[in-house]
């Protein structure tokens, strides 16, 4: 059926059987970003946002999101994660400030952690938006993409950082 593994012979959704796959160390790193006004950037940096420390809350939200990925993405397997690490970097431009987010996830298991890394980076960005939306509803999230993955039978993947005009944060 189309070469998609998440469909059975009748074309209906199914969770892929991974019981025969070997358990190996698998990693993934995903990035996202939040584009905002300079005033919002300044208030985040100076911890002047009424809801609290934006980056600390976003970091915890990203970790929690990675752990809950299988609960919100239907065909994802629940995984025992070895680690989740979130890092932030700022870029100041003439017209805006950009918060760069990288989520790195690791497991030892039978399936990869790409979706956990993507979910983590996305939820970090959404949390920043939620905490700052009173100041700037025009914030833009993205791009969000997988930057790198290791382990598994399909081998490693590393995105050229210039492919989507994203900053290399690895």
UniProtKB/Swiss-Prot annotation:
This is Cyclic pyranopterin monophosphate synthase. It catalyses: (8S)-3',8-cyclo-7,8-dihydroguanosine 5'-triphosphate = cyclic pyranopterin phosphate + diphosphate. Belongs to the MoaC family. Its EC number is 4.6.1.17. Gene3D superfamilies: Molybdopterin cofactor biosynthesis C (MoaC) domain. The active site is at residue 130. The gene is moaC. Homohexamer; trimer of dimers. The keyword Metal-binding does not apply. Catalyzes the conversion of (8S)-3',8-cyclo-7,8-dihydroguanosine 5'-triphosphate to cyclic pyranopterin monophosphate (cPMP). GO terms for biological process: Mo-molybdopterin cofactor biosynthetic process. Keywords: Lyase, Molybdenum cofactor biosynthesis. InterPro entries: MoaC (IPR023045), MoaC_bact/euk (IPR047594), MoaC_sf (IPR036522), MoCo_biosynth_MoaA/MoaC (IPR050105), Mopterin_CF_biosynth-C_dom (IPR002820). One of its GO terms (molecular function) is cyclic pyranopterin monophosphate synthase activity. It comes from the Bacteria. Substrate binds at residues 75-77, 115-116. Pathway: Cofactor biosynthesis; molybdopterin biosynthesis.
């Amino acid at each position: 059926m189309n070469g998609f593994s998440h469909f059975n012979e009748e074309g209906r959704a199914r969770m892929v059987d991974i019981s025969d796959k070997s358990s190996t160390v698998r990693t993934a790193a995903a990035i996202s970003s939040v584009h905002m006004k300079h005033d919002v950037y300044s208030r985040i940096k100076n911890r002047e946002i009424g809801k609290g420390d934006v980056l600390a809350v976003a970091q915890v939200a990203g970790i929690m999101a990675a752990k809950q990925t299988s609960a919100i993405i239907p065909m994802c397997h629940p995984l025992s994660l070895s680690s989740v690490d979130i890092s932030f970097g700022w870029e100041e431009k003439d017209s805006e400030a950009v918060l760069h987010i990288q989520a790195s996830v690791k497991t030892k298991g039978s399936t990869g952690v790409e979706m956990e890394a993507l979910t983590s980076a996305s939820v970090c960005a959404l949390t920043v938006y939620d905490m700052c939306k009173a100041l700037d509803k025009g914030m833009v999230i993205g791009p969000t993409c997988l930057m790198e993955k290791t382990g598994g039978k399909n081998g490693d993947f590393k995105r050229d950082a210039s492919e989507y005009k994203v900053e290399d944060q690895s």
